Amino acid sequence: MVQNIAILGASGYTGAELVRLIATHPAMRIVALSGDRKAGMAMSEVFPFLRHLDLPRLQKIEEIDFSSVDLAFCALPHATSQAVIAGLPRDLKVVDLSADFRLRDPAAYETWYGKPHAAPELQKEAVYGLTEFYRDEIRGARLVAGTGCNAATGQYAIRPLIEAGVIDLDDILIDLKAGVSGAGRSLKENLLHAELSEGTHAYSAGGRHRHLGEFDQEFSKIAGRPVQVRFTPHLTPMNRGILANVYVKGDPQAVHRALTERYLTETFLEVLPFGALPSTRDIRGSNYVHIGVIGDRVPGCAMVVAVLDNLCKGSSGQAIQNANLMLGLDEAAGLGLAPVFP
């Protein structure tokens, strides 16, 4: 049976990525698209690359009839999703791609996002959407919170190592490079071509990046005690992709073995042979994650390198993977597209 889908916030990058992926999904049909500032426009006017698809026109959220919608993807900006989702029908399944429901503790949300949560009752209901680690909870969920793209990349590299007890929990460093599409589609001076090209820079350094809240929450939960990592992201002049270099104290072979065993049966995660390192070019446009492990010149230390596409596995692809579970579909449905190369 085909499931009817609404995409709220379809005029942004993650919304367009949802449309691109669902276009070839065997069991999903897009019946509504919202884009309040572009209401009335065709998606092909906003994103010409979608011109060949037969899609509904963009409309305001309040104009959508949700009575025939099975699941809604909410690709609205952070701090906007809270009020919108609170106003949706209570029996409607929702996958949220914003940061609004990722942190379970209302106090933690206020710490990292600077204001109280507008829908704390939904915050407690939401299931964290790192699919490979929360499958059972996601299957029975009404509201799933998509992870941060940087947070997902780091967790894929580190979670199995904490679970296996093969690293020092007090010495974890994440050095991450991210593509510019992760900053969204709105006009910003620092994202202009002349400002961004031919250079790279750290941002939200010194423990200020909001995805640290997700690392704290998830790693501490696994370890059963507080775990804090050092994390610095860098903006790089590429459209898509994230590369995380994760430095840990632990035997490199044990680190590689723990990751290999944990992801052995996972469709979208591949651990490369020991010593081989991944590249963002090899996962571009796909829902795949590649992970490599190498030893360090310092004995007893290892580096884990993880790459994913921030718009796909880091956001919209992950959202569809979660929606598949929520709707009782094949988890990998619609997500088998090969990476784009070159």
From Swiss-Prot:
Top-rank taxon: Bacteria
Main EC class the enzyme belongs to: oxidoreductase
Active site per database record: C149
Gene Ontology CC: cytoplasm
Stated family: Belongs to the NAGSA dehydrogenase family. Type 1 subfamily.
Protein name, UniProt field: N-acetyl-gamma-glutamyl-phosphate reductase
Lineage, top ranks: Bacteria, Pseudomonadati, Pseudomonadota, Alphaproteobacteria, Rhodobacterales
HAMAP family: ArgC_type1 (MF_00150)
Function: Catalyzes the NADPH-dependent reduction of N-acetyl-5-glutamyl phosphate to yield N-acetyl-L-glutamate 5-semialdehyde.
Pathway: Amino-acid biosynthesis; L-arginine biosynthesis; N(2)-acetyl-L-ornithine from L-glutamate: step 3/4
Subcellular location: Cytoplasm
Species this protein is from: Cereibacter sphaeroides (strain ATCC 17023 / DSM 158 / JCM 6121 / CCUG 31486 / LMG 2827 / NBRC 12203 / NCIMB 8253 / ATH 2.4.1.)
One Pfam family here: Semialdhyde_dh
Originating gene: argC
Catalytic activity field: N-acetyl-L-glutamate 5-semialdehyde + phosphate + NADP(+) = N-acetyl-L-glutamyl 5-phosphate + NADPH + H(+)
Alphabetical keyword list: Amino-acid biosynthesis, Arginine biosynthesis, Cytoplasm, NADP, Oxidoreductase
EC number, UniProt record: 1.2.1.38
Protein's GO biological process: L-arginine biosynthetic process
NCBIfam families the UniProt entry points to: argC
Alphabetized InterPro entries for the sequence: AGPR_type-1 (IPR000706), NAD(P)-bd_dom_sf (IPR036291), NAGSA_dehydrogenase (IPR050085), Semialdehyde_DH_NAD-bd (IPR000534)
One function term, GO molecular function aspect: NADP+ binding
